[in-house]
Amino acid sequence: EASSVVNPENTFFSVKRFIGRKMTEVDEESKQVSYTVVRDENNNVKLECPAIGKQFAAEEISAQVLRKLVDDASKFLNDKVTKAVVTVPAYFNDSQRTATKDAGRIAGLEVLRIINEPTAASLAYGFEKKNNETILVFDLGGGTFDVSVLEVGDGVFEVLSTSGDTHLGGDDFDKRIVDWLASSFKRDEGIDLLKDKQALQRLTETAEKAKMELSSLTQANISLPFITATADGPKHIETTLTRAKFEELWSDLLDRLRTPVENSLRDAKLSFSDLDEVILVGGSTRIPAVIELVKKMTGKAPNVTVNPDEVVALGAAVQAGVLAGDVSDIVLLDVTPLSIGLETLGGVMTKIIPRNTTLPTSKSEVFSTAADGQTSVEINVLQGEREFVRDNKSLGSFRLDGIPPAPRGVPQVEVKFDIDANGILSVTAIDKGTGKKQDITITGASTLPGDEVERMVSEAEKFAKEDKEKREVIDTKNQADSVVYQTEKQLKELGEKVPVPVKEKVEAKLGELKDAINGGETQAIKDAMAALNQEVMQLGQSLYNQPGAGGEPGAAQAQHQEQSSARQIQRAKDPKEMLLMLTSQTASELVEEVVSKMH
């Protein structure tokens, strides 16, 4: 801290807010520090160090901190430390987690596992507990805020839900005091201290000290002699900050703490009365107003039997013991905070892995091509809770080439999603016919800020009904398009085998369905599809009744009763890049089955 006052441009702090982030995501944070934050050619965050004329990535600064911790631990243990368990905020996204892991590698460490800070805290508190308990972990640190709900018992630590805000923490409380002091000084003296980096750093240090004092005292005396100077001489700040005034300065931030708590309980399908323990983690939870908020919301006195500054590290040590085999009978089950899926036809998102899915997890779906002769597919991986692509975040995209030309719906492409125990996502697409594979590990994509995550979740609830209605329109149209395509294809292939009266009826209903699709009214499309399906059933019946036809007359109808909808997936406007997922048979496909039986 002394260095930050005398050498503010070359002293780095609160680097955690920049790790794994793009510059466009940290514009506000970059203005709150005394050192210079710049962007490189890829819009990545760099921290400028004028003393040595070099720019550092946030991972490099974090690595230096880790290296110092490793050196201290090695001296204490009298043994070399080469492996570690590293904790991160629960709402860290994929890029932030990967960047944290990179920092460990830069520091010469093998990072065995990345675990969420609230989860680590529960390990420290719940160690050796035998009774089943439901725990809420309220983790408010210097730069981030996390809430997790867990079930703990018999050595199993299962995370039920997690929520948070990666733009909220003790630094924000400090800034309110800094702004108050600077505003008062500017009003009285006409000088903006925020433009003086050395003065800004002194204000920040003093604000943090005052905040800490107000955790135990009702007022704090602030003295900053020689904060600046004018032609009239040196200027000083001498004032008093009461606890009541401090709480008034950041009352809106206190309100922001409520939402993640409420969200985490709702996602876990629990109420406050279901909680057995409430654990406070992080130095900022010492603030009386924060403690009082937790008491009022949960109706329980928080458990503070473990030092909130040390509890996460203790939990990480327990997890390290589990991985090393020194601690047994403990199982840790964490979750992913956001849903993962693909872009689908009509600009909708199809979720493959829902939010709060237990990690590690792996899920796959089989798709096919959406156009005849299609030789490639492009897959856009999304993160978020809304129904439509435009309201979610694109994590990255990749293309699978070399698919042999074939009729629409024939090739099979398996798309597999894997999220490891560290919460890092990888996606693989395999053409099952040729064995060709393409994959992507989501590490370099622009990251998703925590407040944007909360916005996504809240908007998903707010617009759920509207989104569902729009989604139904698109899904119905997609299904109708598929029915039209398949029916026309079969009529063409069957040719003169179809009796003229039957063919005319099918073509008439086809025309009605096309008109309904153009009209865009969901119910009209459904009615037209049902009418067409009836005529297609009659077509199938007429084929069975022809001499030489095989199978039972009722076979097509029985199969028809099992039909469901079809889904299509696309990445680009070019139909050659579209993916088609068939989950059932349409009525027109039944005709193809009838024809095959005739042969």
Curated annotation (Swiss-Prot):
Subcellular location, principal: plastid
Subcellular location as annotated: Plastid, Chloroplast stroma
Stretches with biased composition (Low complexity): 554-568
One Pfam entry name: HSP70
Region (Disordered): 545-573
NCBIfam families registered for this protein in UniProt: PRK00290.1 (NF001413), prok_dnaK (TIGR02350)
Name of the molecule in the record: Stromal 70 kDa heat shock-related protein, chloroplastic
